[in-house]
UniProtKB/Swiss-Prot annotation:
It catalyses: RNA(n) + a ribonucleoside 5'-triphosphate = RNA(n+1) + diphosphate. It comes from the Archaea. Its EC number is 2.7.7.6. GO terms for biological process: DNA-templated transcription. This is DNA-directed RNA polymerase subunit Rpo12. InterPro entries: RNAP_P/RPABC4, RPABC4/Spt4, Rpo12.
């Protein structure tokens, strides 16, 4: 599940809500930031 955050209104938007437009559906701002996944990845040190 891909989520984006609007830099103007700070609301979290799912990919299904966007459609083909890369704009916030709430405030029509064009700049969205892709959020990092909530899963923590552990890497073994060598």
């Amino acid at each position: 599940m891909v989520e984006y955050k609007c830099l103007n209104c700070k609301k979290i938007i799912k990919l299904e809500e966007l459609g083909k437009r890369a704009r916030c559906p709430h405030c029509s701002y064009k700049i969205l930031v892709k959020l990092r996944p909530k899963v923590v990845k552990h890497v073994k040190a060598r």
